């Protein structure tokens, strides 16, 4: 023993709690004795809560941190009975669990074996009554632990729930209390001074302070009432000067201020209290301007009337009462300038990349300014904020070195106003200048904003000015030229270009319509592509090559979508134009080509994302594409290509794309979308053409998406037969993979798919089902096992699991019926090496309840156990033809248990004699066989323990390696992956153990039968001795009978009584001798039949073992090699 009490002579398990329970040499001593006894007696009624191994090794009990000596959690796990009992939960049928009434919510309250309570709900465990603190721990995994110790039943499995913390908490993983105290809750409530000043309005003050509302509500109601004759001017639609409207508003504002003043006068009701209240508010918010709040309150209540008056005045151009109410931007003017381009406004920007920047600013500014037309914008401050934001968008310098001067700003603002097409924009500006709180002239920036808009209005208010005429003419020329492109009028375009060439030659003016771009930033070249006008596109490029420089072409893009010419050409599928653009791109440097191809649009997509429109282009530009670049949906170009399910040449598309992508540096994980789908998940067909499965590394064929679907389950779910066939042949495939969320396996998805398929898809579904079942029978089941269990569901009416069998016969049976058939078989064949029902179903007792999260997982293991049972039956010589009949899986009915017992008894009562010599031979044979079987059993038990421990230690090794990598990343200031606490996976040893345990169970069964017969032999000898003794006594009576024969008719009464007593004694001896002789005959018959049966079963055992062990090794090799292939270790030399 080590100093700390832990065993030093056994292979320690890395998790201290599991090591204490399953690998404890002191299990028969306190404090472990009672715990071990409870677990051993009803191991299926308990579930062990397992904290992370690293946490137990490296953390302390939080309660001990305040004391002078800290207590490590691993010491509690080894020595503290309460800690151990607190992590063992009663989940059996007698655990008194309170389940949630809603089935979708997996929640239940359970008691630990020390009387504490936990709540299991929605993947979390919450500590409750009895625990020192209210904590919560996340459930990270569940599983079964195969026991290998001698003090638990052989082959027993214990349910484990893995969590991310201990139920005592830990020093490295602090958890807050579930419910805050009332004081803490009160502290979270915002105090008045925490309310932002900007969010305070006068209306809010009225709601929050009833005293203030009581003082001013009635006067304000009268002020804003429609019958208020004093301000009737605002309610009559007559032509009037704008100053009159402004004056009426000012008067109402003064009335509002007076209402506030009157409310705080000492002679008014509650005046003093109202005054004190307002002073208290102002002290709490020193930055609050009460006059501003009142102004905004009046403005909100009068907005509808004010705005209606302004609209009426600005609409009456024929009978204007005020020159300031002139409507400049009419619908006609907007139409006249609708095609105006930025290059035609004397903006000193020639570089195409800077022009793109300005066009994008204009587009964003148009969106912002268009908010003025929103009917919910009813305050001058909101309107001012909109035009202020518009100016800020145009002048921002965050991503550009371009400086915007005043003249440039006016030009940009003209574009914004003209293309936003806001009706009555003049009224909006007038409202801002005349109805806002304060004076604009006091703020220099606001004055600059307003003056900028005034300048735009001035420039566009004089249609007779040459500047406006030029803009109108330019807009008209743009419209006519773009219309020619869209209508494919090549002859007219040719004549127009010839005329332009004669007029300007190589040097086009900056404001020429050939260089014009619409509000989306689309040039004539872009419009030609959009309209699929190849002739015009070629004509524009070839008429005079000096008109469009290489920079003009490379930076020609739709500024709203950021799509360049090549992207649009691919989208429009204009292959000839695409080819021309590729030729032009070939004249650039390699760096320029890569930058152009991988520049992204508004959705984050590059040219590579659109190559599926012309997949032959991949061979030319594939080497330039960044295939790992993700768009906003996390699609890489390769991922996007694979999703083109309706492509006319999908196979060629996939083959071409993967031939360009696949290389030794190909990273499979990079091509995953935000839902966790890999390329294998979304590939419709052509998996062989892709060559993905031929890659030696980086390909995880078992990866799951956010819905816990693997590529295999996706192919089954969506009927992708071609991919399914190819994937089933891959050595890395985990065919029986179960997701960690619902524990569905491939057979569940086959069942789901079969139920969802309609009549048209039924043939496809049946074909998929056939492939899945055939693969399972080929790789997981021996040839002679023709029927296995695939699915099950719980029947609430029968309170039993209904099992679905598939094979030569498709049968549905209840689990209880299967167990009864097994029991009947054992009654009929008491000496069969097939174990008893209790041994086979040791871990799955009848009516055994488990935690809700364990239900599906436990059912999967039960089906697994049932199939292994069927496999073992198929390897028994007596069941070569139909092993499934043993469990009642045949069409013929089984006889009852009573009939089976009568048949066995009748067989045993048949006459048969065994001589002592024969008996000695039988005894010698059985004794020698028992000795050999015990030696084999001892070796088998050791081997099974080794298999179990080996699988656990492999998991421990992997856990230690992950913990080491986590610590190393923390030391290197890297972002480590989240530490996990998962169930030990199967490294192949668990699979081998599941079959080798049957060798152990059959040996135990044969030895038990041998011991039973040896006991019968002892009974036979004792009975034989009694028969000989009784026969000797009978001979003595018969000899004395002749001596007493002469006195038989004596009249002496006393002498006659003696003779009568001897006769009675003689009769009793005869009867006793007859009974013992009959019993001896039965024993002889039973021993002979049992001997023959056991001898046959020993022969069957040798044949059974010779078949089972190679099959078990084959399954071990399959699981182990699958893991090696999955991890890429098969390439190591």
Swiss-Prot record:
VPS9 domain ranges (all copies): 324-469
A Gene Ontology cellular-component term: transport vesicle
Signal peptide annotation: none
Sections of the chain in a coiled coil: none
A GO term for molecular function: guanyl-nucleotide exchange factor activity
Matching SUPFAM superfamilies: Ankyrin repeat, VPS9 domain
Origin superkingdom: Eukaryota
Gene Ontology biological-process annotations: early endosome to late endosome transport
InterPro entries found in the cross-reference section: Ankyrin_rpt-contain_sf, UPF0507/Ank_repeat_27, VPS9, VPS9_dom_sf
Similarity comment text for this entry: Belongs to the UPF0507 family.
Protein name: UPF0507 protein PGUG_02975
Species the sequence originates in: Meyerozyma guilliermondii (strain ATCC 6260 / CBS 566 / DSM 6381 / JCM 1539 / NBRC 10279 / NRRL Y-324) (Yeast)
């Amino acid at each position: 023993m080590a100093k700390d009490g832990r065993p030093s002579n056994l292979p320690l398990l890395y998790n201290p709690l599991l090591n204490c329970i399953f690998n404890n040499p002191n299990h028969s001593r306190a404090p472990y004795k009672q715990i071990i006894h409870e677990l051993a007696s009803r191991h299926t009624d308990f579930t062990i809560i397992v904290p992370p191994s690293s946490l137990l090794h490296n953390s302390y009990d939080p309660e001990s941190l305040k004391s002078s000596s800290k207590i490590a959690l691993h010491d509690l796990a080894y020595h503290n009975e309460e800690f151990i009992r607190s992590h063992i939960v009663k989940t059996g049928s007698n655990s008194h669990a309170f389940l949630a009434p809603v089935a979708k919510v997996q929640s239940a309250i359970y008691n630990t074996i020390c009387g504490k309570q936990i709540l299991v709900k929605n993947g979390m465990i919450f500590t409750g009554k009895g625990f020192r603190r209210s904590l919560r721990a996340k459930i990270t995994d569940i599983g079964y632990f195969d026991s290998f110790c001698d003090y638990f039943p052989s082959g027993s499995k214990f349910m484990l729930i893995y969590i991310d913390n201990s139920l005592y908490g830990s020093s490295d993983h602090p958890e807050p209390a579930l419910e805050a105290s009332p004081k803490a809750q009160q502290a979270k409530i915002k105090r008045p001074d925490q309310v932002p000043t900007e969010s305070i309005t006068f209306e809010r003050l009225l709601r929050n302070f009833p005293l203030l509302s009581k003082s001013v509500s009635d006067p304000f109601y009268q002020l804003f009432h429609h019958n208020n004759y004093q301000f009737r001017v605002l309610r009559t639609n007559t032509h009037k000067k704008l100053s009159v409207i402004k004056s009426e508003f000012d008067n109402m504002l003064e009335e509002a201020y007076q209402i506030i003043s009157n409310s705080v006068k000492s002679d008014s009701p509650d005046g003093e209290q109202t005054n004190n209240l307002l002073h208290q508010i102002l002290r709490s918010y020193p930055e609050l301007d009460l006059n501003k709040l009142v102004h905004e309150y009046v403005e909100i209540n009068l907005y509808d009337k004010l705005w209606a008056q302004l609209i009426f005045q600005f609409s009456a151009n024929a009978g204007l009462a005020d020159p300031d109410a002139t409507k400049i931007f009419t619908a006609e003017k907007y139409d006249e300038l609708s095609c105006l381009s930025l290059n035609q406004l004397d903006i000193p920007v020639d570089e195409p990349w800077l022009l793109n920047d300005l066009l994008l600013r204009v587009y964003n500014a148009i969106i912002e300014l268009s908010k003025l037309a929103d009917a919910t914008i009813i305050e001058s401050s909101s309107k001012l904020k909109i035009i202020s934001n518009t100016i800020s968008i145009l002048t921002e310098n965050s991503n550009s070195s371009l400086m915007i001067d005043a003249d440039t700003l006016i030009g940009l603002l003209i574009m914004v106003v003209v293309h936003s097409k806001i009706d009555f924009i003049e009224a909006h500006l007038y409202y801002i200048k005349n109805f806002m709180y304060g004076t604009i002239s006091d703020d220099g920036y606001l004055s600059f904003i307003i003056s900028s808009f005034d300048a735009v209005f001035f420039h566009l208010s004089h249609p007779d000015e040459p500047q406006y005429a030029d803009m109108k003419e330019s807009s008209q020329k743009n419209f006519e030229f773009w219309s020619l492109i869209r209508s494919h009028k090549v002859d007219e375009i040719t004549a127009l270009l010839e005329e332009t060439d004669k007029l300007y030659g190589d040097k086009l003016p900056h404001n020429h319509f050939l260089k014009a771009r619409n509000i989306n930033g689309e040039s004539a070249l872009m419009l030609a592509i959009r309209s699929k006008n190849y002739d015009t596109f070629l004509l524009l490029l070839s008429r005079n090559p000096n008109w469009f420089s290489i920079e003009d072409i490379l930076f020609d893009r739709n500024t709203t979508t950021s799509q360049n010419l090549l992207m649009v050409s691919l989208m429009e599928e204009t292959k000839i134009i695409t080819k021309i653009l590729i030729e032009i791109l070939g004249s650039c440097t390699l760096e320029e080509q890569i930058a152009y191809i991988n520049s992204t649009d508004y959705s984050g997509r590059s040219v590579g994302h659109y190559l599926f429109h012309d997949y032959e282009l991949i061979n030319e530009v594939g080497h330039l594409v960044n295939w790992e670049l993700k768009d906003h949906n996390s699609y890489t170009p390769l991922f996007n290509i694979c999703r083109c399910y309706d492509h006319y040449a999908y196979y060629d598309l996939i083959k071409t794309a993967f031939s360009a992508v696949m290389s030794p540096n190909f990273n499979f994980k990079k091509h995953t979308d935000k839902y966790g789908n890999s390329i294998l998940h979304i590939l419709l067909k052509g998996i062989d053409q892709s060559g993905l499965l031929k890659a030696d590394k980086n390909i995880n064929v078992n990866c799951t998406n956010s819905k816990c679907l693997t590529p295999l389950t996706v192919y089954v779910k969506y009927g992708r037969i071609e991919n399914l066939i190819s994937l089933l042949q891959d050595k890395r495939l985990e065919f029986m993979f179960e997701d960690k969320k619902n524990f569905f396996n491939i057979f569940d998805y086959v069942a789901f798919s079969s139920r969802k398929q309609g009549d048209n898809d039924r043939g496809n579904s049946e074909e998929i089902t056939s492939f899945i079942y055939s693969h399972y029978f080929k790789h997981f089941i021996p040839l002679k096992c023709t029927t296995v269990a695939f699915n099950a569901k719980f029947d609430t009416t029968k309170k039993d699991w209904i099992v679905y069998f598939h094979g030569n016969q498709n049968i549905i049976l209840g689990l209880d019926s299967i167990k009864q058939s097994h029991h009947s078989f054992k009654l009929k064949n008491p000496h069969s090496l097939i174990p008893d029902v209790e041994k086979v179903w040791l871990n799955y007792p009848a009516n055994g309840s488990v935690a809700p999260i364990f239900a599906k997982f436990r059912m999967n293991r039960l089906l697994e156990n049932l199939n292994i049972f069927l496999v073992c039956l198929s390897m028994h010589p007596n069941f070569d033809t139909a092993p499934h009949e043993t469990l009642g899986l045949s069409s013929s009915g089984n006889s009852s248990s009573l009939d089976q017992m009568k048949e066995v008894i009748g067989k045993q009562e048949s006459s048969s004699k065994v001589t002592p010599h024969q008996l000695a031979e039988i005894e010698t044979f059985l004794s020698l066989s028992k000795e050999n079987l015990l030696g084999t059993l001892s070796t088998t038990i050791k081997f099974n323990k080794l298999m179990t421990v080996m699988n656990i230690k492999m998991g421990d090794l992997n856990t230690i390696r992950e913990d080491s990598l986590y610590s190393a990343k923390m030391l290197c200031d890297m972002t480590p992956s989240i530490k996990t606490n998962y169930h030990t996976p199967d490294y192949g040893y668990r699979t081998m153990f599941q079959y080798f345990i049957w060798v152990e169970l059959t040996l135990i069964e044969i030895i038990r039968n041998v011991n039973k017969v040896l006991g019968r032999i002892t009974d036979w000898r004792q009975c034989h001795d009694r028969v000989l003794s009784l026969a000797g006594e009978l001979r003595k009576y018969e000899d004395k009978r002749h001596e007493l024969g002469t006195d038989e008719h004596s009249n002496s009464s006393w002498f006659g009584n003696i003779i009568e007593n001897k006769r009675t004694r003689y009769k009793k001896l005869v009867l006793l001798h007859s009974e013992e002789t009959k019993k001896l005959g039965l024993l002889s018959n039973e021993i002979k039949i049992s001997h023959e049966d056991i001898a046959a079963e020993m022969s069957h055992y040798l044949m059974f073992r010779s078949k089972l062990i190679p099959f078990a090794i084959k399954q071990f090799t399959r699981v182990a090699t699958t893991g090696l292939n999955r991890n890429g270790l098969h390439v190591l030399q």
